[in-house]
Each structure stands twice: as C-alpha cells, then as structure tokens.
Amino acid sequence: MLELKKREVKVSEKQIETKGRKWAVDHGWYCRKFTSPAHRSVPDRLFLKDGIVVFIEFKKPGNVPTKAQWEEILEIRSKGGRADWTDSVERMIEILEGRHEEWHPPS
C-alpha cells in the first residue's frame, strides 16, 4: 500500500510579516517598516492606531529574538512604549489588540 506523507509547510519570517501587515492595514493600522541607521536590531515594524504605537519584531516559527533584539524591545518598554515579538500572525493580532502577555527573555 502506498503511504502518503504529509508535506511539512515551512513559513518564513517574511510571509508572517507580509500577512500580518495586510491584516493590520485592513483593520485600520498605520504600518511601516522600521529601520534606524545608527542602531541595529530594532523591531521590524511600527504600527500606529488611535494614538497607540506598537513595535513588533517578526521571527519565523520556532525562532526567538537575539540578545540584541531583546535589549531593544526592553529599552522601548522601559520608556513606556509597547514592543514585543511574534512568530505567528495570530500572536501579532493579539499584540495589536492588547490581549497578550508580554514575552520576556529567558533567564
């Protein structure tokens, strides 16, 4: 008997970021790629809606931010900003809607 194997679908960081951006724009968020020439490791995207600014670092499923990326996220938080990271569109939606638990770097 022929056995069929499930094809593992690999999702890239770019695919998550693209789908997430589309969802955000469709739901009224101003969304821009975020870069800072003098600083490496800043979050990938800036989102703005109703006076709320959120920075999000995107990762492919199963990956986590680097130490430098964590430092940037924590720096933004220390100044009262909202910053987090995601490895899925679903989590990005939770972050933007403010119904998530902040993730913290491993101890």
Predicted regions, residues:
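Catalytic phosphate/metal-binding cores of nucleic-acid and nucleotide-processing enzymes, i.e., regions
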Residues: 1-107
